[in-house]
């Protein structure tokens, strides 16, 4: 009897899913979907009816979103690029590679916007077993692919696949280097963050750059920020310091925009079309003294 009830339940659920599936494809092929919003609604209905899971839904939406993004929205900003200079010797190049743990590096001349080429870290391996005096960087460089900030991300992905390269240098309207983009940056827009064996397990949300400046991830909890900087930002409406900054602006600010909140200077150093990513904050001497005093009290 129990087996019969279980069979009937399974049959009913299967029939419901089949009916929804037929309705879904009917809307596709009969041209009922008029815009992107309706398509997104259908995809989310598919998840609720268990035709697809959450990961699949997020990937489909990610594919749709990259068609609306420009390279400037996802690029690594120039300030975060690790460059190698044409006059570096072998030991200096190896030091840069070891510290950064990257596999590809833009190589520049004395003029920062003059890209000589791209160095692959693996191309230095043969020099580890030979005389370092034979090292000559220039012949090792591969041509750099240059793309404008305005290039569509879906076109960029197509070029990565068809031309079989993995990194491109991004330039602004004046030809100055503004960032770089990799195929991984695009794939992360579709499937989420991709961590490899070199990614840090523990993410540092607040990092001191100089006596008065700090790099702060926008996703830092307000409570953690308040504790670090002896501030009193409220967390009733937003949860992160990025939310506080957006609330103060009244809109999603772009990279380079600045604002002062509670006498602390905030500058957006990284952002895309959907969210803030990284901030740089500047504190005064008085605030720094309060921070240091609070640190001393914690230690006591």
UniProtKB/Swiss-Prot annotation:
GO function terms (MF aspect): flavin adenine dinucleotide binding
Domain CBS stretches: 75-134, 140-197
Source organism of the structure: Pasteurella multocida (strain Pm70)
GO cellular component: plasma membrane
Gene (name only): corC
Pfam family, one: CBS
InterPro entries from the UniProt entry: CBS_dom, CBS_dom_sf, CorC_N, FAD-bd_PCMH-like_sf, FAD-bd_PCMH_sub2, Ion_transp-like_CBS, Transptr-assoc_dom
Functional description taken from the UniProt entry: Plays a role in the transport of magnesium and cobalt ions.
Superkingdom, taxonomy of origin: Bacteria
Keywords attached to this entry: CBS domain, Cobalt, Magnesium, Repeat, Transport
Name the record gives this protein: Magnesium and cobalt efflux protein CorC
UniProt key word Repeat: yes
Family: Belongs to the UPF0053 family.
UniProt keyword annotation of Transport present: yes
